Amino acid sequence: MAVRVGINGFGRIGRQSLKAILERAPEIEVVAVNDIVDVPMNALLFAHDSTYGNFNGTVTHTDDSIVVNGKAIKVLQITDPTKLPWADLGVDIVIESTGRFTEADKARAHIDAGAKKVLISAPAKGEDITIVLGVNEGLYDSAKHTIISNASCTTNCLAPFAKVLNDSFGIEKGVMNTIHSYTNDQKILDVAHKDPRRARSAGLNMIPTTTGAAKALALVIPELKGKVDGFSLRVPTPTVSIVDFAVNLRDETTAAAINDAFRAAAAGSLKGILGVSDEPLVSMDFKGDSRSSIIDSALTMVIGGTGKFAKVLSWYDNEWGYSSRVADLTKFIAERL
């Protein structure tokens, strides 16, 4: 019997996650989405996307469902997750993508409503485990872990190549900066926001702000706790971001040796997660790339040619790459129910 999934929150990540599941894990049955937006608007936004173009399939709707490739997916409009009919719908896994229920105590409402597992598509608080595929999924224990976080898009970019660096050369200290596309948390025009910098127009400014990616790195690679910090620079592009990581290594090395380590991992244990690009590309060339992290090999540097201080830059589609991991992690959890 197919594993049944509900999606709570049908915004940017919720919609892309459904598309990724249809593409990457068609054996999983998405039976419902819950969102305050009405059915016709949900169908329209799923079918037509200003960033990625039109959905490669059919999308229609009824009074209470969107119909994707002939399969009806019920649309709910329930604000209290404890009242969601997950039990009646036989939902096994809920993808929590509203951004409102990232605390485990709040996300657990889906369990109370009848689901078996909750996958939070964001950094979480009090979760049973944070998983970055390719890095620490081996620690997952279905008997113990009910509330699972998929971390952030930036942590999913940083952690795989940080793992390679740490395993191969040792990380002593590092500072990361993500040059990150704007998100729905920002404003089109200047308006009040709890972060005074994010209060400014997303389309007109480069906006320094915070990121939890560096600290979250320690959740999946514990030996890096306290060794890495960083920030975010939001820029006026719709998707595709890049992590710029300056790092002091334990061992002396060269840029070529670092890139060779990345290539070996990308062809082996991190295949499909980590990539290496040798071409002189720009951000839009990575739009729609399903990998979590794509090293720009020409930008890898080691001061003096041989040394311990290095810089690595890695691209990621912060929407599609991340949503692909949501789909993959959903499949991973489903296979272990």
Where are these regions (language model features)?
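Short, flexible, solvent-exposed loop/turn segments with mixed acidic/basic and small polar residues
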Residues: 194-196, 233-238, 299-303
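Generic structural signal for well-ordered, non-membrane alpha-helical segments
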Residues: 14, 103, 151-154, 158, ...
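Catalytic core of tubulin tyrosine ligase-like
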Residues: 170-232, 247
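N-terminal Rossmann-like NAD(P) cofactor-binding subdomain of oxidoreductases
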Residues: 1-199, 304-305, 328, 336-337
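Glycine-rich beta-alpha junction loops
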Residues: 36-38, 124-125, 152-154, 178-185, ...
